[in-house]
């Protein structure tokens, strides 16, 4: 099963690398193929200080955890996503959170499930009839 991973999933995996999310990312090779876009890297960089403060983990350990997690995720160049999928994604999330557009667009592009811990996004997309969004428990 193809699964697009959004930023809050990686954020959670770094905060608790031995938790359920970290376990799914690191030990599900035969069940799931994980994908994301480079926007995830930008968001993690933007929130690095917050991640460091919340986790109490130093910079080198955060970098190490990212490297381990990223070895299990295929990064797709957002320039390869068709403009129609960008537009459709934007239309789906513009009233929720425009920052989720790249992840929704990639899900549309590769016809994959979107794995998110964002309850607001999950609820709003499901209300719009989206059936390809998953929570950690559903995964």
Q: Where are the regions that the model predicts?
A:
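Acidic, PIN/NYN-like endoribonuclease modules and their adjacent C-terminal/linker elements
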Residues: 108-139
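Alpha-helix capping/helix-boundary segments
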Residues: 9-10, 40, 103, 120-121
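Residue-level signal for well-ordered alpha-helical positions
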Residues: 17, 47, 127-128
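PIN-domain endoribonuclease scaffold, especially VapC-family toxins
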Residues: 27-31, 35-87
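Glycine-rich, phosphate-binding/catalytic loops in enzymes
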Residues: 20-23, 52-53, 131-133
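Short, well-structured N-terminal submotif of metal-dependent ribonuclease cores
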Residues: 1-36
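Active-site neighborhoods of divalent-metal-dependent phosphate/nucleic-acid chemistry enzymes
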Residues: 74-113
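Acidic active-site catalytic centers that drive phospho-/nucleotidyl reactions
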Residues: 6, 100, 118
């Amino acid at each position: 099963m193809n699964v697009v991973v959004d930023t809050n999933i990686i954020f959670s995996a770094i905060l608790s690398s031995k938790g359920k999310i970290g376990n799914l990312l690191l030990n599900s090779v035969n069940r799931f193929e994980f994908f994301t876009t480079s926007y995830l890297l930008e968001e993690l960089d933007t929130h690095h200080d917050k991640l460091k403060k919340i986790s109490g983990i130093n910079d080198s350990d955060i970098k190490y955890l990212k490297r381990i997690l990223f070895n299990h995720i295929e990064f797709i160049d957002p320039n390869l996503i068709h403009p129609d999928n960008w537009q459709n994604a934007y239309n789906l999330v513009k009233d929720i959170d425009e920052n989720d557009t790249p992840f929704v667009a990639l899900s549309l592009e590769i016809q994959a499930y979107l794995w998110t811990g964002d309850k607001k996004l999950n609820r709003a997309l499901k209300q719009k009839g989206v059936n390809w969004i998953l929570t950690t428990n559903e995964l």
